């Protein structure tokens, strides 16, 4: 069992950076990984050569660093910011080229004015005061405060110069920005202090593992800890003198080894972590055991692998209860527990997950349903919209698992530079296994978001086929909508029993079937948010119910951003997927609207969609809300409540701001 005395405090003497404990070749990605774990001896010249190559690589890594950023041997500073990110081996903003490939490619970019750009800044979503942010890092609850760290560029509204931003909150809604937690000041992270995770030791102290990009652009894992464990704000962090604690193992490229997870306890009392990587086109998750977080033993087996999924970033691994609606600490295991493996796919920029079984004895995991394994085309996703690099943590304060995610922009980089900021975080979500289906997760905004609700209006409306109804709620830029829909039973029975109604469930797709304007027998129907009076700009969030070949109904939950803005330098996809609807359930949705972000939750959070939208005229008081039913044959009854939402308290760092937040 790890003892905090072995780690905290670390003596002031300079320790040599540590090599990984295991120097075995990488496991064959085609090898069966669910048998007993066996230590294989090195055999023959191949193994000796592999070991020597690894030692040479490691010696070169340590010996050649000069302790500072290298412009001539590291990243080419003459490259654009975008290519800097790709050269470094991480994802960056990819929208600039996309709109130019659309029908607007021959048209000059839209001319945004300051009023439009100012409106895009959110009121109750977390984002830095200015400049660029991306991945959530090391979220935790400590001494009465929620801590949120994040990838941050303090110098510009584009990716680069990454450090760890830091903010604290009492309730996950109201925040105070704190000074930067960790900067790129060592050779092993001089090209960026990248994504990492926090682990609580048995005595309540904290260790933080994070990826550093070295002065030679090699991805290594590093250890840090609070300078003063008695400081509830955790203002200062100390990097372990022996960093890096892990370097890329044999067979792994220098830029394919990043984003360590929160550690969990094994049955032997060791700590275990997993780190994302790839072998050729196969996405993999490496596994390491440690006792003191300084030295590590690499397991011969992989936690999991899926061919043709590419690089796995920001891997997350955690238990969920099969029977209860509460969250579980990361180390919990047992017969009533399933485990989630989630990976952020560098190739597609989607966060995929699967439900499965974890084997503590050899550190492997298998999915319950191999046909929807992590990263496969048909696999499950946390969110079917703009949602990436997510990170969960166990909130011991309320016994729940909370999920954060980076919500990037869908506009051009030039617009980001003009407005002076880029990206934000989604509203934190609770995440549990859907105990009704046992096959998927359910996500829901944390309960604290309700504290921002102001005035509300309730509606019960019957909406006939082809109808659009204005919903009188005043300005619709900051809303929380909870709605329940029911298709008229007579219409439903008539369509199900009518052989002439085309079975379309197998062919329908939110993304490819034309959006909310394409009419079917039973849909689409829902809300148009951030709409102008004339509907020239609108973002529909809707259900589409399709009849299958067996006359069974299949329900889809979609968001159509194709008409969200008349601007031509914006990517405007149609998002969505099928949503499970059980017998006897009505169709339900919740929508959070906060200026340029729309978060939608179908059927209690079984299917979620986050969108970034940039209207040019549906802003300020001109932003409206509409209810619509574009079905051909069905009447729909909608019962819903709309709340106006207050702004969150998100302030710069000062003693007074911290005191004010302490009083909430």
Curated annotation (Swiss-Prot):
Induction: Induced by gibberellin (e.g. gibberellic acid GA) that accumulates in seeds after red light treatment. Accumulates upon infection with virulent but not with avirulent P.syringae. Degraded in a VPEgamma-dependent manner during senescence. Keywords: Abscisic acid signaling pathway, Disulfide bond, Endoplasmic reticulum, Glycoprotein, Glycosidase, Golgi apparatus, Hydrolase, Membrane, Signal-anchor, Transmembrane, Transmembrane helix, Vacuole, Zymogen. Disruption phenotype: Reduced carbon fixation rates during the day, but increased respiration during the night. Shorter roots. Mostly expressed in stems, roots and flowers, and, to a lower extent, in mature leaves. Residues 1-108 form a propeptide. Residues 1-43 are cytoplasmic. InterPro entries: Beta-fructofuranosidase_N, ConA-like_dom_sf, Fructan_Metab_Enzymes, Glyco_hydro_32, Glyco_hydro_32_AS, Glyco_hydro_32_C, Glyco_hydro_32_N, Glyco_hydro_beta-prop_sf. Residues 65-664 are lumenal. The chain crosses the membrane at residues 44-64. Pathway: Glycan biosynthesis; sucrose metabolism. It catalyses: Hydrolysis of terminal non-reducing beta-D-fructofuranoside residues in beta-D-fructofuranosides. Its EC number is 3.2.1.26. Signal peptide: none annotated. A motif (Critical for trafficking from the trans-Golgi network to the prevacuolar compartment and from the prevacuolar compartment to the central vacuole) lies at residues 14-16. SMART domains: Glyco_32. Its main location: other. SUPFAM superfamilies: Arabinanase/levansucrase/invertase, Concanavalin A-like lectins/glucanases. It is a single-pass type II membrane protein. Glycans are attached at residues 113, 280, 362, 498. Belongs to the glycosyl hydrolase 32 family. This is Acid beta-fructofuranosidase 4, vacuolar.
